[in-house]
From Swiss-Prot:
Signal peptide: none annotated. HAMAP family: CitG. The lineage of its organism: Bacteria, Bacillati, Bacillota, Bacilli, Lactobacillales. This is Probable 2-(5''-triphosphoribosyl)-3'-dephosphocoenzyme-A synthase. One of its GO terms (molecular function) is triphosphoribosyl-dephospho-CoA synthase activity. It holds the Pfam family CitG.
Length: 294
């Protein structure tokens, strides 16, 4: 019974990734229609990546459940070790293309936290589908003590390094903390912004329209390391401003699709991809499934 419940929830994480890549059109991003601003990956590359990561999603939630009473840092280390194996498997499946590195990191923590939370709230194991927004908040808050050390541990000694990953370079140049920062703050972009917005949208619109509007909203607020890496601070600010204007227009679904298709070509021409917003889109979908919003 326990394993079946954990399996079903881990499959919601996979489903969230499938929904994210399938949502179309998504400016600058891989979707059903085209590869966005990416020359090295396609819709099928994402499918390959998700299949490779799927067994690890199960391992993350089972680890959180099994070690719920363990000291938080020890649980984090277990999840990170699994996450590193998952990353290697992903790169093998994609021939070295980075499809889900940051999202895998976040999913490892959130699925681990979900497992730990379920171990402490056994009624959810027998009444699956009863997740509330308070449950979501509690799960995200569990990540905060697990990752409180992370910025200092991973990014605090970069002055001794000669070569940086692009995430490290963003921190050194702009102070952008990326997925580490989001995790160490308890995923407040999710709990305070993305999910409240989506709960409102889904109560007023059909699911796909709500998802497209959520993407636009995220692109208007997220500190997007992918955009900054590709185009710099000004390009990122420009995308945010454009998306704020698009939100203010309150377009019909048909006109919104047309606007996003047009903006897709704009971002392709600039080689810009809002990958940070895409990751948070997938994470929002995961909790939307838990809360039965979708």
């Amino acid at each position: 019974m326990t394993k079946a419940v954990l399996t079903s929830i881990s499959q919601l994480a996979l489903k969230a990734l499938l929904y994210e890549v399938s949502l179309s059109p998504k400016p600058g991003l891989v979707d059903r229609f085209d590869n966005g601003a990416h020359d090295d990956m396609s819709f099928m590359t994402f499918i390959d990546s998700m299949i490779a990561l799927s067994p690890f999603f199960q391992a993350y939630i089972e680890t959180g459940f099994a070690y719920a009473k363990e000291e938080q840092l020890l649980l984090f280390n277990r999840l990170r070790q699994l996450g590193q194996k998952a990353e290697e498997t992903m790169f093998c499946a994609t021939q070295g293309i980075n499809t889900h590195k940051g999202l895998n990191f976040s999913m490892a923590l959130l699925l681990g936290a979900t497992g730990a939370y379920l171990a402490r709230t056994p009624h959810l194991m027998t009444d699956l589908g009863c997740f509330s927004k308070e449950d979501t908040l509690a799960i995200c808050r569990l990540v905060k003590p697990m990752t409180a050390h992370l910025i200092q541990a991973d990014l605090g000694h970069l002055n001794t390094k000669k070569e940086f990953t692009y995430g490290e370079q963003l921190f050194v140049t702009y102070g952008i903390k990326g997925p580490r920062g989001e995790a160490s703050e308890g995923f407040t972009t999710l709990t305070d912004h993305a999910l409240p917005y989506f709960r409102q949208m889904i109560s007023q619109n059909d699911p796909e329209t709500s998802q497209l509007r959520l993407l636009v909203y995220l692109m208007s607020i997220v500190e997007d390391g992918n955009l900054i890496h590709r185009g710099g601070i000004e390009a990122w600010k420009g995308v945010k401003a454009d998306m704020r204007l698009l939100l203010q227009q309150d377009l019909s679904t048909t006109d919104l699709r047309l606007a996003l298709s047009s903006y897709n070509q704009c971002l392709i021409n600039q080689h810009l991809s809002p990958g940070g917003a895409a990751d948070l889109l997938a994470l929002t979908f995961y909790f939307a499934f838990l809360e039965k919003l979708l």
